């Protein structure tokens, strides 16, 4: 189908001209083919009126755990290690494949409602996440979470699972699914096991998605065990020799950030989750000023407790000003980059998504700015970073397909998903 979005303001995320006050976007199939004045020679099947709206690249949630929506509001006001060991991991051990399927569907619905078109997920039963991704029409990077166990055969099986996931789903669903390798963290995987993970990533020619330096305790224990920080440890054993999505990077030193820059690692900032779990705040402004590609994420819906990337953009842009006593820290456009083009770079997808440009995939969010909280329209970049709400998202296009229009999702029965999640979540806690 050929689409025209007409008379729309455009935040393209192109360096030379990020904002256009009024333009027209032509989409042919899954690709953006023309941006500019109305061209009567281009035939279209559908016209979307963009008057009093702004088109932006689809938001990219670069770190999350979608199936954890079943545990939203289940265990709150608890520090990370207690939260994991006493509350989350015991319940997760009872999860079924169907649980993860329905929980992931719910998370994808929530993301679409709030303008997210691409995610990077680490969980298990990833075939079910892939099926949900295919059905909903969203774009995703899937990583099977790998935690080393005492049984060597189980550990080998986890690597085989990842290889199978890659062979089954990588570049499938019209190219909307990619697969990376997902070791949970350096404190849950030994050096020798991580080296096996790296070899698998090299074999598959893909990246690694891992938690890094999320808490002070993790860093302290790394120094006790290895005599170095988690970042230095991961570099020394070769993890950063492949493209790495490093979730959190909260407690990182100047030496660590130099390593992240040198090895072209992409940290993912999860400010709300890090704040809620009292983990701290990553030195994002300093990393950005060093030229490090920092992406943005929500973390899981059980530790955030939502998947609203507009909240993350707003928080990322504001809290860093307070932390640094610097009103210029993480300006509005930089926060928006973290949620779009930086996320695309982190996920090795920036040649296709992350900005609205001719030749790129049509992952576009149309936001209604004809609302009281948007007026007056002095600066639309500031408005998107500091003012926009998830409920302002009107239309979502992914891979050239209209997934949501007038806030109605077209690909999945939302009521059915909510019903099944409520039923399964209550049952899960009682198992």
From Swiss-Prot:
Keyword terms of this UniProt record: Hydrolase, Metal-binding, Zinc
Catalysis performed (reactions): S-adenosyl-L-homocysteine + H2O + H(+) = S-inosyl-L-homocysteine + NH4(+); S-methyl-5'-thioadenosine + H2O + H(+) = S-methyl-5'-thioinosine + NH4(+)
Binding locations of Zn(2+): 63, 65, 211, 299
A single GO molecular function term of this UniProt record: S-adenosylhomocysteine deaminase activity
Catalytic EC class: hydrolase
Keyword Hydrolase carried by entry: yes
Binding locations of substrate: 92, 144, 184, 214, 299
Cofactor notes: Binds 1 zinc ion per subunit.
Enzyme Commission code(s) on record: 3.5.4.28, 3.5.4.31
Superkingdom to which the source organism belongs: Bacteria
A Pfam cross-reference name: Amidohydro_1
CDD domains: ATZ_TRZ_like
Names of the cofactor(s): Zn(2+)
Homology family: Belongs to the metallo-dependent hydrolases superfamily. MTA/SAH deaminase family.
Protein task: Catalyzes the deamination of 5-methylthioadenosine and S-adenosyl-L-homocysteine into 5-methylthioinosine and S-inosyl-L-homocysteine, respectively. Is also able to deaminate adenosine.
PANTHER family recorded: AMIDOHYDROLASE-RELATED DOMAIN-CONTAINING PROTEIN, AMINOHYDROLASE SSNA-RELATED
Protein name: 5-methylthioadenosine/S-adenosylhomocysteine deaminase
Originating organism: Thermoanaerobacter pseudethanolicus (strain ATCC 33223 / 39E) (Clostridium thermohydrosulfuricum)
């Amino acid at each position: 189908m050929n689409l025209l979005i007409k008379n729309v303001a455009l935040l393209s995320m192109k360096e030379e001209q990020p904002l256009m006050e009024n333009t027209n976007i032509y989409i042919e199939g899954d690709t953006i083919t023309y941006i500019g004045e109305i061209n009567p020679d281009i035939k279209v099947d559908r016209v979307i009126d963009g008057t009093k709206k702004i088109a932006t690249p689809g938001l990219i949630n670069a770190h999350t755990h979608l199936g954890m929506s079943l545990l939203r509001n289940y265990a709150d006001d608890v520090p990370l290690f207690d939260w994991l060991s006493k509350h989350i991991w015991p319940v997760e051990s009872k999860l079924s494949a169907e649980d993860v399927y329905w929980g992931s569907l719910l998370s994808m619905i929530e993301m679409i409602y709030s303008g997210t078109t691409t995610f990077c997920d680490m969980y298990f039963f990833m075939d079910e996440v892939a099926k949900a991704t295919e059905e909903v029409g969203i774009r995703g990077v899937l990583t099977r979470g790998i935690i080393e166990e005492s049984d060597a055969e189980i550990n080998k099986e986890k690597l085989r699972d990842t290889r199978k996931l890659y062979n089954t789903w990588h570049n499938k669903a019209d190219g909307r699914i990619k697969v990376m390798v997902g070791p949970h963290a350096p404190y849950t995987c030994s050096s020798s096991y991580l080296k096996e993970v790296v070899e698998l990533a090299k074999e598959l020619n893909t990246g690694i998605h891992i938690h890094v330096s999320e808490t002070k305790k993790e860093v302290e224990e790394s120094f006790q065990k290895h005599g170095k920080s988690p970042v230095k440890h991961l570099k020394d054993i070769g993890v950063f020799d492949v493209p790495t999505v490093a979730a959190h990077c909260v407690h990182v030193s100047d030496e660590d950030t130099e390593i992240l820059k040198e090895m072209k690692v992409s940290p993912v900032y999860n400010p709300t989750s890090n704040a809620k779990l009292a983990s701290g705040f990553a030195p994002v402004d300093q990393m950005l000023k060093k030229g490090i590609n920092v992406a943005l994420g929500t973390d899981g819906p059980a530790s955030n407790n939502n998947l609203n990337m507009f909240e993350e953009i707003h928080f990322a842009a504001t809290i860093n000003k307070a932390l640094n006593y610097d009103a210029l820290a993480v300006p509005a456009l930089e926060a928006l980059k973290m949620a779009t083009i930086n996320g695309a770079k982190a996920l090795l997808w920036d040649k296709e998504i992350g900005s609205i440009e001719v030749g790129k995939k049509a992952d576009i969010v149309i936001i209604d700015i004809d609302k009281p909280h948007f007026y007056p329209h002095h600066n639309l970049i500031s408005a998107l970073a500091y003012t926009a709400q998830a409920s302002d998202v009107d239309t979502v296009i992914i891979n050239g397909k209209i997934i949501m229009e007038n806030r109605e999702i077209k690909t999945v029965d939302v009521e059915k998903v909510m019903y099944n999640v409520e039923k399964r979540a209550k049952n899960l806690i009682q198992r």
